[in-house]
Regions:
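Non-catalytic C-terminal accessory region of glycerolipid acyltransferases
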Residues: 242-367
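A short glycine-rich, Lys/Arg-flanked "PGG" loop and its adjoining helix->strand segment in the class I
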Residues: 480-492
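A transmembrane-helix-recognition feature enriched in membrane-embedded lipid enzymes
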Residues: 106-167, 224-225, 371-374, 521
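Catalytic core of membrane glycerolipid acyltransferases/transacylases, capturing the structured
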Residues: 131, 135-151, 182-237
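Membrane-embedded transmembrane helical bundles of large multi-pass transporters/channels
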Residues: 1-111
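C-terminal alpha-helical "lid/dimerization" subdomain adjacent to the S-adenosyl-L-methionine
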Residues: 499-544, 554-555
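Conserved alpha-helix/loop element of class I SAM-dependent methyltransferases that forms part
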Residues: 379-395
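Class I SAM-dependent methyltransferase SAM/SAH-binding core
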Residues: 408-446, 451-454
């Protein structure tokens, strides 16, 4: 009997945990509280069980007494676990990282990160052991340092190469990809984004020493290696560093310095301090500017274990001579060079070619329902991460997306170009709630979502309006009225980008109509208030002419009748 009762209590504990998880997930998805009512229901359920069966504790029969004890202890245990353990775990792996603007943890991400960190720890321990052995080898210290430095270089190259979620690109001064730096020695200055920067420098430069904080030299694992290799301390003073730097450069070593002094939280380059440039100018060695892109997204500051997939660029620029150069002027000039090149890398890789953006977008919809997650994965794949929208729409200015759904396109366009000020409008309050409770919004201050009917809500003045896959939900009169209202709010040089069907394409229209049947009637993913009204190319051209706009057309694909209608003054 006790076994049967224990099994029953265990089953109730499962139900309690499901209720708690449902409340946690609902708040994470929509921002609305459902947990408190669930907790109340759990309390009364447990209370009824304890009072009803737990009262048998006063019975004198040993079997009834035993049943009561098991009930009381069991119910207290399952309620305690449901009330405490589950919220704590959910907060640690979902709520906390997303509140800091990072994706939630998944089991795969945790295992992947563990696998990534095991080799560096074991490799560091092995190199630490070799450092002790090297101290006993009867050879020149510079030769022993070079051997250990070469091992670090090879180990970091292997580490970056086997980490499948890191897509490294090492670019030389001529713009070509390089395996490692084989140029002259000098002082390396680089923007500082992440702890990955150190690994990338070690993977690029075979002989390099770092300017580090004192705690690095005294740390238990890396301290011995750092001291053996002769890393520079910030507190040792310029004069001592100058003497050492002359010897090291003559021996082929580079000195790596991060002139910002700290890692950037958002990738933006801060003011360069002058110390590294003073050292280079005093010794007369060139400054080697290095530009990092993407590391802050893959392994951000204070979030090194919550890594994401993405492109990591290490660009080594042409060495800058310091002969007859004043270090103040040198600081300003190289800072401008690094910032300009970083901006160019952002223009190139803040785009659909970088897998980070799609991975980040999908991660913002996990734990929000399997249908939602599946839809976003499939939709972004079909849209090629919204590459066409990104290429056509302005890179800055106000963009209004009418019929934004859950906002996946708006998130992507905002991540590609933070200068875009985007407003997403949709009349489905549930979808807007999902969009408004995405962790991505914490990193995109110029993106907002509003719930409203496109036919009635006030439209803001915009540089571009996007009406994608929603025009056929309106009747013909409302379609023309909406485009007219957009044209009236269009700023000079602006555009209206419409994607909808071309009902004159008979073959493709059958596929488009069938897909709408699935989305509106079978899956009921999209809400509609009436019959669907698919627009034609000729009618769209008539509307554009009526509102005083010129229209160009581009087919969306070869299967459906979906067509891009680009309307401009």
């Amino acid at each position: 009997m006790n076994i049967i009762l224990s099994t029953f209590i265990f089953g109730m504990g499962d139900d309690f945990s499901i209720f708690i998880m449902e409340g946690l997930l609902y708040k994470y998805k929509t921002g609305k509280k459902l947990l408190d009512p669930h907790k109340t229901a759990i309390f009364f359920s447990a209370f009824t069980m304890i009072v009803g069966i737990g009262a048998l504790v006063f019975a004198r029969h040993p079997a009834l007494h035993s049943i009561a004890i098991i009930t009381i202890l069991g119910m207290f245990a399952v309620v305690l676990v449901a009330y405490t353990a589950e919220p704590v775990i959910f907060n640690a792996f979902v709520t906390k990282p997303t509140s800091q603007g990072r994706p939630p943890f998944t089991l795969w991400a945790i295992l992947r990160n563990i696998v990534f960190y095991i080799p560096p720890v074991l490799g560091s321990a092995f190199i630490l052991l070799l450092s002790f052995v090297a101290m006993l080898v009867p050879a020149k210290k510079s030769s022993r340092q070079a051997a250990i430095g070469w091992m670090l270089h090879r180990a970091c190259r292997i580490l970056v190469g086997y980490a499948a979620f890191i897509h490294p690109k090492r670019i030389g001064p001529d713009g070509e990809l390089i395996r490692s730096w084989n140029g002259e020695a000098g002082v390396i200055v680089a923007n500082h984004q992440s702890s990955l920067d150190i690994i990338m420098i070690l993977a690029t430069f075979p002989k390099v020493k770092f300017m580090v904080a004192d705690w690095v030299l005294t740390s238990p694992l890396f301290g011995v290696i750092s001291r053996f290799l002769g890393y520079y301390s910030r507190s040792e003073g310029y004069e001592k560093s100058l003497e050492r730097l002359r010897v090291d450069v003559a021996d082929g070593w580079c000195l790596a310095v991060f002139p910002e002094g700290t890692r950037s939280l958002n990738g933006k380059i801060k003011r360069f301090h002058k110390g590294a440039f003073y050292l280079a100018s005093q010794v007369g060695v060139p400054v080697i500017p290095v530009v990092f892109y993407g590391n802050w997204r893959i392994a951000p500051k204070n979030q090194g274990f919550n890594m994401t997939e993405g492109i990591a660029v290490t660009e080594v620029m042409a060495p800058v001579s310091t002969i007859s150069a004043e270090y103040h002027e040198l600081t300003v000039r190289i800072s401008s060079l690094v910032k300009a090149e970083y901006a160019e890398l952002c223009r190139k890789y803040d785009s659909p070619v970088n897998p980070y953006f799609r991975k980040a977008l999908v991660s913002s919809y996990i734990y929000k329902g399997p249908v939602t997650e599946w839809y976003v994965k499939v939709k972004t794949k079909m849209e090629d991460s919204y590459s066409f929208f990104h290429s056509v729409l302005p890179r800055e200015g106000r963009i209004t997306d009418i019929g934004c759904g859950m906002g996946q396109m708006d998130f992507m366009l905002s991540m590609y170009c933070p200068e875009r000020r985007i407003i997403g409008i949709d009349y489905d309050a549930d979808k807007i709630a999902v969009a408004q409770n995405s962790w991505l919004l914490k990193n995109l201050p110029d993106l907002e979502f509003r719930c409203g009917n496109a036919s009635e809500c006030e439209l803001p003045e915009s540089n571009a309006f996007v009406i994608s896959d929603m025009l056929h939900y309106l009747d013909p009169q409302a379609q023309e009225a909406l485009i007219r209202r957009c044209a009236e709010k269009l700023l000079p040089g602006g555009m209206i980008l419409v994607r909808d069907s071309d009902s004159e394409n008979a073959k493709g229209q059958k596929v488009t109509a069938l897909s709408e049947v699935f989305s509106t009637r079978i899956l009921a993913f999209n809400r509609t208030q009436g019959e669907l009204n698919f627009i034609s190319h000729s009618r769209m051209e008539t509307i554009a002419s009526t509102v005083g706009l010129k229209m160009t057309v581009r087919s969306n694909d070869a299967v459906t009748s979906n067509t891009f209608y680009i309307l401009k003054f």
